[in-house]
Amino acid sequence: MQNLYDVIIVGGGPAGLNAAVVLGRCHRKVLLFDTGQPRNLHSEGMHNYLTRDHILPTAFLKIAHDEIKKYGVQFRYIQIIKAHKDGKGIFIITDRKNKTYHSKKLLIATGLTDNIPAIDGFKECYGKTVHHCPYCDGWEVSGKSVGIYAKEKNGFDLAVSLKTWTPSVTLYTDGASNLKPSQIKSLKKYNIGIETNTFQKLQHKKGRLQKIIFNGGDSKDCDAIFFVNGFQQQVDLAKNIGCKMSDKGVVLTNKSQGTNISGLFVAGDASKDMHFVVVAAAEGAKAGVTINKELQKESLEALLNKS
């Protein structure tokens, strides 16, 4: 097959990119698909990644692309809409223009997308003063007035966690009551406020949160919000091809990022609960090494079968 790739990678975040550099350095024929919409696109800086503290996600991607292209990895900037495995074990990938590509191995690293509350101001503040991970953005709100938005989910754990970074924490339920009586009692002991008024909007200036405006006209000053509203797969590619999923909606993988489908790997946020850039990159590296080892083994077996 003339245009058979060793590996096709779907997803151009840290997991897909790190797998690409590993495989490129192994002289593998690699094609990487990217839509340019990473989960942290609107973030003002990455953290917990040594030597890259507070780098803009776009700057990180540019550095990564420049490095990877040195090793012959090909890029296509288009969405992949489906993938399947044929009877000969070859993966067939189809893009949104209905063009197909073929590979021996497939790595899906498309990540997750956050369910941003559908309240005026949330989307505009997301990545600036509205966040979902205190380990990623907690330092930047140290000592400030921080709110936890938890209508659809129980926000107890996140509220307690934020006390590590600031003494001023309030849990906002937006009219819901997901808290257990014992949790309410504990929050009071931790000096964490509970606000049940329903949200009308976030008052902000260019994404800088100023106040929470409630229905009825009341308001409360607030510097930043962390929300607990769940997430979903950015695309359902892994699920649709038959990968097993966890109850939390992430793809089940083994220690080498392999799935229940032979030759198919998933790395990054799409497969794990700990959503750090550095963890996603490490998973991509693990997947890359395992994929190369499988390709080595298959090549040797093919040579032995010929002799």
Place the predicted regions along the sequence by residue:
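FAD-site-proximal beta/loop scaffold in flavoenzymes
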Residues: 124-140, 230-276, 286, 293
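Beta1-alpha1 glycine-rich phosphate/pyrophosphate-binding loop at the start
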Residues: 5-59, 151-177
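FAD-binding core/adjacent interface of flavoenzyme oxidoreductases
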Residues: 1-7, 75-144, 251-255, 259
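A Rossmann-like FAD-binding core segment of flavoenzymes
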Residues: 62, 68-95, 100-101, 166-250, ...
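Anion (oxyanion) recognition and catalysis
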Residues: 24, 69, 124, 163, ...
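A conserved FAD-binding loop/helix module that cradles the flavin
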Residues: 20, 156-158, 267-307
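Short, well-ordered coil/turn residues at beta-beta hairpins
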Residues: 11, 109-111, 116-118, 149, ...
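Rossmann-fold dinucleotide-binding core
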Residues: 132-142, 146-149, 155-159, 165-166
